[in-house]
Structure formats: structure tokens, C-alpha cells
Amino acid sequence: MCGRYYLSIDLGNLSFVDNLSNYDFEDNFNIAPQASVPVVIDNSLVNCTWGYYPQWLKDQSNSKPLFNTRFESLLEKKTFISAFKKSRCLVPISGWYEWKVIDDAKQPFFFKHKDNENMFAAGLYWQRSDGTTEFTIITTAAPIEINEVHDRSPLILDDVSMGIWLSDDNPESIHQNISHDFGNNIEHFQVTRSVNNPKNNNPSLIEEFNEVPF
């Protein structure tokens, strides 16, 4: 699962985006579901809401948005089949958080590229009649290199898989050819529990943190 992430726009690895010079985004160290964040759609950065409410859902007040979608479900569940066929996107991500229970307390960990490079997660998006756009992050089984904290992970795409994800290939071919072998490029470490509160948003959240025993 991916319930929080960090994004700092990197001009270098977004050079393929058409509207980069006109786009302004402040670093966000604690992005939570329902936040408005940039997503790459048709080679442009578009402000989208993280979390999708199925259009058949009449009452959203008692429901939570789908901010993650399992890769394994893309060809199985009607909720996702249409978007998987024609509405795939890239989610720029500088790192993400996962939690693990240690000594009866949930300890947050931060995951990032070993070379501090920005990454792209696979995503799906839905355009609403009111002009807003919602998206979900695709998750997969966490690679063995990082699965000690959580058994799920965002599906991080390398350059080849980015091309496949955005291609016009048929969905079955895309599903079969996407690489899930990204674990060697990821490192993780404990961070402060201050990240538990989505109102906290500062660089200290992504710094390695070890409590000093008394």
C-alpha cells in the first residue's frame, strides 16, 4: 500500500513534459489522499486529486476514495478495466512512506531512490464532468529487497516500462510486459513519527531517525 508520499519536482527527469516551464509546485513532504498533486497525462503535468470515487457510487460521504489499485486487479475488476485501457498516467514521486508495527507501535519508514532520483509510479486517472481529475497509484507485491516493512509497494517504472505503460499496446500485452524489478534501486530507513500527522510538512520528515533508548 502507499498512503503517503513525498514529491519535489525535478526538472531533469521531467524534461519530456510539455508545460514544465509554466508549472509551479512547492515541495510537499507529506502528501495524503485527497491532496491535489501533479500527474503526467499526455505529456503534461495536470493537477489531480489523489483518490478515485467510482462513478456508480451515489453517496461518497460514507466511503473512502480508492487511492491505491492492485496491479493484479487491472484486468479483473470492472471498476478499473476501462481506465486501464485508455487512461494510464505517470505519478511523479520522490519517495513514499510505509508503516511497520514495532514494539506495539506503528513505526514509519521512508523509501527513496538510492541516488535520490525522482521516480514515476504507474497510475490510472478519471476525468469528472465538473472538470476535475482523480487518480489512483498502482501497487504491486513489494520486491524482496524492500518487503520487510510492507508486502505492497507502488509500481515504480523504469524507462522501458514507462514507455510500455503509456503505449497504445493492448492491455493484456502491457500487463504482461511491465517490469516489477525495481527493488535494487530503492533504499529505506526509519523516520520520525511526526509524519503520522498529515498536517506536518517539512524536510525533517524524510530524514533518517533513530530513537535514543533511555
Regions found by a protein language model. Give the residues of each.
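Short linear sequence motif anchored by a di-proline
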Residues: M1-F214
